[in-house]
Amino acid sequence: MTNIIGKIFSITSFGSSHGKALGAVVDGCPANLELSEEDIQIELNKRRPGTSALTTSRQEGDKIEIVSGIFEGKTDGTPITGIVYNTNQKSKDYSNIKNTPRPGHGDFCWMERYGIYDYNGGGRGSGRITIGHVIGGAIAKKLLKTQGIEITSHVVQIGDIKAKNIDYENLEENIAKNNVKCGDLEAAELMEELILAKKEEGDSVGGIVETIATGVPAGLGEPVFGKLDGDLAQILMSINAVKGVEIGLGFESAKSSASEINDEFYYDENDDGTKSIKTKTNNSGGILGGMSNGMPIVSRIAVKPTPSISKIQNTIDLEKEENATIEISGRHDPCICPRVTAVAESATAIILADHMIRGGFIHPTNLKKSI
C-alpha cells in the first residue's frame, strides 16, 4: 500500500474513517516557515463535514493537533506531524455491508487484494482520509505564499448544470457566497437545487472541480517521468471519487486544430520597465512539455456521484456466495464536489511545493535563504 507522495516535500497519509485518528507526516518542509495550528485549521474547515445541507450530516470538528516539527512558531526542518481525532463514528451503520460489497465503492477490490477490510465507514478507502491531503496541503500553501503563489479551486459543473458566467476577477469572493463553492452565483443556485433534489431521492450527483494556481514561475517540472502535469494528475487521481483529470483545454484539444489552440508568446511591459514573457491564450493550462511556462496552471477533475445512496441496489453476499441486495444507511454526501475543492487545492499545493524545492526556487532546508 502506497501512502507517500513527493520526492523532497513529501506527505505520508495515515488513518481511517472510523479509526481513532487520521493525519499526515510532512517531511522536507524547510525550516523557518511561520506555521500554526490555525493555518491548518482554516484549510480543514473548508472540507469539514456537516457544514451545510449539501454535505453529510456527520458532525466532526476536525480539530488539528500538531505534535512535531514546530519550534517557537516556526518549522524546524524536522518532520511535521498533524493529527485529527475522530469523534462521531457510528460503526453500527455499516454492520450490514461486512460481506456485501457496496456498488461503486472499492470494498470488493480491497477484500480481493488484502483479504481483510475495515468496512466501517469505508476504512482507509473513505473520503475522510483526504484529511491527510489537506494537512499537507495547508503547509504547502503557506510555503508557496512566501513565493507569491496562490491556489483556488471552485465547482464549475454539477450534473448537467454548468457555470457559464464565472467572474474570475472576484472568484474567491463569489465562492464564499454559496455552499456549492461555485464562482457563477446564478448557476450555484441551480446546482444547489439539484443536489438537494438528489438528496431527497436518496441519490447523489457528481460534477467537475477546477483548480487555478497563479504566480507559478516558468521551469517547474522534470521530463520525462517527472513532468509537472504527470505529478499533478497522480495526486489529483488519489482523491476519492475522482475519475478524470485534464490540464488546460484538456480533452477539448483533441477536436481542435493546432492553429486554433496553440498559445502564442508575447512580451508584456511591466510597470517598472521590465518585460515578462506571456502567452495570448492559456489553452495549455500553464504547462508545456511537462514544465510550467509562467502562466496560471489550470486543472479540472471529474468527480463521480457519491456511491453510498439509500436506494436498493444489487450486489453479492461473499459469505453465502449468492446474489443479494443492499440498502445503505449512514450519513453521506449527496454531492462531494463542494468539499473536494479544499482537497484539490491542497493536492495541487503539495506537488507545486515539491517541484519548487526540486527546481531550486525554494531552499530545501532554510526558507530564509529563499526570501
PLM ranges: what are they?
Residues 1-58:
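N-terminal, positively charged regions that mediate nucleic acid binding
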Residues 10, 308-371:
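Internal helix-turn-beta structural module
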Residues 10-13, 118-129, 218-222, 282-288, ...:
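A short glycine/serine-rich beta->alpha loop
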Residues 13-20, 202-205, 209-323:
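Glycine-rich anion/phosphate-binding loop at the beta-strand->alpha-helix junction
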Residues 20-32, 128-149, 230-234, 295-297, ...:
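Alpha-helical support elements that line or immediately flank enzyme active sites
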Residues 44-103, 107:
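Glycine-rich, N-terminal phosphate-binding loop and its surrounding beta-alpha-beta segment
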Residues 97-123, 314-332:
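Short acidic, glycine/tyrosine-flanked loop/strand segments centered on an H-E-D-like triad
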Residues 113-224:
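Glycine-rich, mobile lid/loop segments that gate access to catalytic sites or pores
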